[in-house]
Amino acid sequence: SFTKNILILLVTHMIVKIIGVVNKIYLTNREGFGDEGNAIYSSAFQIYALFLTICSIGIPNAVSKLVSERLAIGDSKGAHKVFKIAVIAFGALGFTCSIILFTCAHNISHNWFQIPEAELSLVALSPSIFFVSITAVVRGYFNGRENISAGANSQTIEQIFRTVITIILIEVISRSTGTDTRIMAAGAAIATTMSEIICFTYLFKYYKSASREIANEMKNSLNYKYRGIRKTISDILAVSIPMSIGPILAGINKNIDSMTIVRGLKNFMTDSSAKLEYGMLVGKIDTLVVFPLSFNAAFTSTLIPMVAAAKASNNFAPVQRKIKFSLLTALLIGIPCTVGMMLFAKPILELLFPNQPDGANLLQISAISITFMMLSQNVNAILQGLGKTIIPTIGLIVGMAIKLALNLILVPINPNVFFLGGTNGAAFATVSSNIVMFVISGMFLKKFIKVGIQKRQIIKIVLATVMMAICTIFIYNSFLCIISSKLCIILALVFAVAIYLV
């Protein structure tokens, strides 16, 4: 059901994101890692994530769709054949991409990023691509069998082990080699690969435990229709490629920062300072800005099939209220998060990253993106459900072009000369890109479907946020002279949530 799937995915996303934030807080505050370690690891992770997108992003949905179609007509044998062919095909693709990343690590780190220390992290991450490719197929297979919990549990397990292994490896490295940031970043990368292997092992064992049930279903299979390997692969690609174009472009968009920020900052600062500035943005700021999206991410996974079903039956009335609810939820969460991070950027950073508290200006600028990113998530999911996948793609291309242009223009400018120079310029470029992407998608959505959100509903949310902001500022300033700033911001944020909900 819609509500059940929303809850499962919401809880999973929340757990994964919270553990991820804990992991980032630990790394950033760890002596020897800090902002420089974030720069090294994050630059490597962005190109790794792009390879993952190519190998796996559209695969779960494609496999899920084909498997569910076969099972709907009783063809369990055909459904399992899709799974087997997908494992072999995309396992081979993942293995190839692992080899490419491994062999190109030196060139990418030295020439693309201009962060030579990232080479070891890229090498450590490369084996993970193979395992993630197969894991994506297994998740898709069980999703097609309407078993969402298998994939959700595997994501939680992967994130828990990543954090635990990261802490263990970083502590071992720091005690054996000292605070060598390059080695510590590589240790974090190794932890990522190990956690993906553990996730793969969990899903493999899960599949083995279900193999008897699957075998019995195959014996009683109905309406089996032979399809060749080439035909099956082409069917998967026909579904996965349109779904992957957007995420691939988004991955390229992320790598714009990796390839332009350090290069641009070197115009007016040293290599070391440039890495620290870049690490500050991609390590701390991006983590905080993206975190609220986990409250909203569950909607994107459930809106696509729901809207697609409504389109197929040409009956949108049942889903109108759910679409409106998803967009209002994005506003209800996004607007106060934006305002809260803008008002309390400095105390939030001091609370979470006491050893590396810099970056308040960056957080204030970047926080503007939150509401637009959350709205874009849901709008793009609705458009995909309507079969209008080209529209989010167009928005991404335009947004990416704007981000690249602004990065190239603003990042090389010293922020002492112009406020929106340096990393402030990169943050502003990201905000501009996200606004443009939402506007393009939103304009087209209004042409295809009636959203039904009234202006007075938006005004209510804005007024509630303003009231929350005024009360929270008063509470924070009143208690600041009595208790510590860290305790004060915790108290203020608790009151903020309570006031807003009331």
Q: What are the functions of these language-model segments?
A:
Residues 149, 160-202, 206, 390, ...:
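Membrane-interface helix-loop junctions in multi-pass transport and translocation proteins
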Residues 3-6, 42, 77-92, 233, ...:
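Interfacial transmembrane-helix starts/ends
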Residues 2, 181-189, 201-245, 317, ...:
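Interhelical loop/hinge segments that connect adjacent transmembrane helices in multipass membrane
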Residues 57-72, 290-314:
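Helix-loop junctions and terminal segments of transmembrane helices
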